[in-house]
Structures are given as structure tokens and as C-alpha cells.
Amino acid sequence: MGRRYFGTDGIRGKVGDAPITPDFVLRLGYAAGKVLASAPGRAASGARPTVLIGKDTRVSGYMLEAALEAGFSAAGVDVMLAGPMPTPGVAYLTRALRLSAGVVISASHNPYHDNGIKFFSADGNKLPDEIEAEIEAWLDKPLDCAASDGLGKARRLDDAAGRYIEFCKSTFPAAFDLRGMKLVVDCAHGAAYQVAPHVFHELGADVIPIGVAPNGFNINDGVGATAPDALMRAVRANHADLGIALDGDADRLLVVDHTGRLYNGDELLYVLVKDRIATNGQVEGAVGTLMTNFAVEVALKEAGVQFVRAAVGDRYVLEQLRERGWQLGAEGSGHILSLDRHSTGDGIVSALLVLAALKRSGKTLAQMLEGVTLFPQKLINVRMKPGADWKGSEAIRRAIDSAEQALSGSGRVLIRASGTEPVLRVMVEARQATDANRHAEAIADAVKQATA
């Protein structure tokens, strides 16, 4: 059964345009509620399902929360409201409170005018494709509201923030604290604005918070992981030891060192793997994506660590980790997974893992990454006619083969079609930027000529 609305990270779009409308979200809540109520063992036990709803700081979150709550209530499902809460916080609380499911109202790193809905199962994992398909099937059925005595009830979870703060702190080694460290924490005017500064402060750090004044319209606007320049300036201006950049729903992390240098998810993955090797003796493998920088793959293999590339998207990184029984994976954008700490990517927990690695090693980030220099990447988006057969073009194949032969193990070529528009993405990595640029442009020219 296919899916019409769910993508790789829930349902997302511009508020007011289908499907991110109040009427659709109400029906979505009802449909999800009916699926939860019919889950194996649920009907037999007679227990009423309970879901947790969290959101980020977008002005539309209040409207969509009310619609979602109404839909669940109509399906006979109880609701707990967490208020503004990072996506990984909802995943944790759903699992810790033994709830039926968790729901996050957020569009993550997107601008304020977008929003979305994503679900977590009772164990804090994203819903399987087949459950999302079941929910979509219920969207086509009439909304048959429960009788008055069967309506779901709603209440606020008053201690949600405190519970999540304590969970985050519990992932940091008891032998360490952050006393003597000055940290700039950028919360992107998003879901972590109330919790992230407290986590680091309660562990002893001198915290300088930025991006903690949400007004409903400024989430991710010039701050956070998608706009790290503000953090880089703040770290230098305040002579801080480290800067921590989260995105709107706090499932991503980028880090800035004391010099103002930015470190992405690829580099942080390498740091965490090296820390695990130092503490545990070995790491069997790690997972990146098709976009992970080639230099990180080379460095991990030199350290004796297997490296696997998943499709782009933390959902696919998670799938590969589970399939292999590994713990560490990441995307360059800052989604970092450490499955022995959390079931999903968590920007705050990932920052604590990095800080623990620095404490254990006594090194700076630059020192831990010594010898690992990211390869320059050249990305060219080539527009094509819809349906153009670029895979069957001999000219494109020759251009790709020529680049791969020239790079000969010192770089790589990645060609992939966009899933949302008629664009072919041509990416080349090489040790020298001039080589990456030259080969990418040659392939892009071949694509343009072959698909004109």
C-alpha cells in the first residue's frame, strides 16, 4: 500500500496549503487515533490509548495542536500536551511514560510559514511505513465521532520540560561536569529554547543563550544550525570554549570551536567514533549517507571502522544501524544517532556526547580531527525536462567514467535525481577544489546537452 501524504519525516508543507490545513489535521488525528485503538492487544484490553503532543514555536502550532487534539478526542483517544518540546524530547517522553504514541508538530529547519506532523511509536521510534499507510487509509473513511462518554480527554503534562532535562543530563558521564566551560547555546528560537540552556547550566557550564526569544515567526531566522554565522560571531565575541547550534526542533547539531570554526555532522561522527574506540577498544562500524564527505569515510576505514552509506535522511541511517546492530551514524546536516543513548537523533544529547569526548581526551575538536581534512565538494543542480532519460545517455556515462578514472580513489562522483523537482544533482568530491569543480562542470555540461 503506497503513501500519499507521509514522506521520509512525516507530513510537511506550507500552512494553509493542503495538506497542512486545520481540517486535514483534524482528520489526521482521528485516523491515527483509530489505528492506535485497533492495535493488537489494545481492543482486547479495553485500555484507552493515550498520545503525547509536542510542538515547536511556530505561530501555526497552536492552531494545528487544537485540530489534532480534536481529532484524537473524536476517536476516543486521550491526549497529553507537552507544549514546546524538542522532537527527541517527545520521543523520550512517549517511551518513558508508556504512552501509545507521540506526535510532533514541527517543520524542523524550515521557515515559520511551513509546518508538519510526525509520529513516534510507543517505543520512541518513527512509525513503520505500514502503520503510516494504515493511517492514510483511515483518512478516506467517514469521521464517526465517539459518543460523549467515549470522547478522549486532554490534559497538560506540566513537568514535561523537567523530565526531558533530567534525561539529557543522564546521558553525560557522572564522572565529568562542565564547570569552567563557557558555552554559547543557539536554540534557533525553536523548541529547545526552554530546555537546552538549563541542561548545560545544570551540568556546571557558564551558558550564553542565543535564539531563545521565539515570537512565532522567527524560528530558524538567521540563527540555529541552518544559519550558524550568528553562533560563530557570538563564540568569538564572548571568548567561549564552544558553541552549540540546534535547529528548530532540536534534532540537529552543529558545533563551533573557540576559534569560530564550524564542525558539521560528518566531522562530529568521526569524533564520536574515535572517542568510542578510545573508551571501548573498538567500533565495528558507523553509518553515513550518500552525501557524507569522502575524507571521513577514508579516515574511519584507516581507523579499522567499517563505513556504510545510507540514502539521504536520518530515517535511512537509522534503518542501516538497526540492520547491522551498530550504534553511531550521522548526516552532514547534523542529524547524529547514538542508539545506546536515544532512539532518535537528539541535538542536546549529541552535544553532550561531543563534550564528553573532549573531556575524556583532553583535546580540542581540531586536535581530535587532526589529519582529517574534508574534501572540497562541488554541487551543481541541472534542470531537465520532466521524464528525461539521463540514465540511458552514453555521453553522461562517459563523463562520469572519465571523472571517476581521473579521481582514482582520491575522490568520488555522486549523481542523483531530486525527488521533488526535475533536477539532476551532480556532486563531485576531490582533494583539490579545482579538480572537483572541473569534473562537476564537465558532467553537468554532458547532462545539459543530453537532456536538452
UniProtKB/Swiss-Prot annotation:
Reading the lineage from the top rank, the first entry is Bacteria
Provide the cofactor note recorded for this chain's UniProt entry: Binds 1 Mg(2+) ion per subunit.
GO: which molecular function terms? magnesium ion binding; phosphoglucosamine mutase activity; phosphomannomutase activity
Arranged from A to Z, the UniProt key words for this protein are:
Isomerase, Magnesium, Metal-binding, Phosphoprotein
Catalytic reaction(s) noted: alpha-D-glucosamine 1-phosphate = D-glucosamine 6-phosphate
Q: What does this protein do?
A: Catalyzes the conversion of glucosamine-6-phosphate to glucosamine-1-phosphate.
- Sequence similarity: Belongs to the phosphohexose mutase family.
Protein name as catalogued: Phosphoglucosamine mutase
Q: Which organism is it from?
A: Burkholderia mallei (strain ATCC 23344)
